[in-house]
Amino acid sequence: MNNFFEVKNVDFVAGGKTKVRNMSFAIENEGDVICLLGPSGIGKTTILRTIAGLQKIKNGSIELKGKTISSSDVNVEPEDRNISLAFQENSLFPHYTVEKNILLGLEKNKGKKEKQIDLKEILDLLDLSNILKQYPHQISAGEAQRTSLARTLLTQPDLLLLDEPLSNVDQSFKEEIQIRLKKILKNLKISTIIVTHDSYEAFYLGSKCGIIFDQELRQLSLIHI
């Protein structure tokens, strides 16, 4: 039986420099959440960008639902992968309101899934209902990050990639959002890869957690909390 998603012996490269060598890991079952833990600059974002198809690979392969999407001679275009990436930095359209930015996720998802996500539920869980009419320049970095997360969730991808998803969220509110995000991911059963430098976040959100150190994935273990 094939794994739902699998990386096989891939070197992840950015700017001509190898960030992570000969990396292999898998999401065995749809809906599992894997967290990759490591400090800034270790190559976590490069891993996500490569999985999303924004960077090519020269060795190994990446497979989703039994299909090769990246290898030395295969590179499925990003828009054809049904993978959604929420960047750490602000990726909102500045001239769209928060509401319109979020609804772009629904437009991308239109007709893709039989069961649609409850928009109100996502807005409530991420505490966005009171800022829908504001523009990106009028909201905080944490609110912008949660807006981007809502938009990405609404695309209902086969694979969700989250780059430091709560790094800009105010510390006084962060734990509550972690609880809500875990609930969302469990309810939606979206397979997810989260990269973070926050060990608590990694162990709380992930069903498995891997540690990246010295250009290698040192460990990928099942988490019991």
Q: What does each model-found stretch correspond to?
A:
Residues 60-71:
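Conserved ABC transporter NBD signature motif
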Residues 69-85, 108:
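ABC ATPase NBD coupling module
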Residues 160-164:
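Catalytic Walker B motif of ABC-type/P-loop ATPase nucleotide-binding domains
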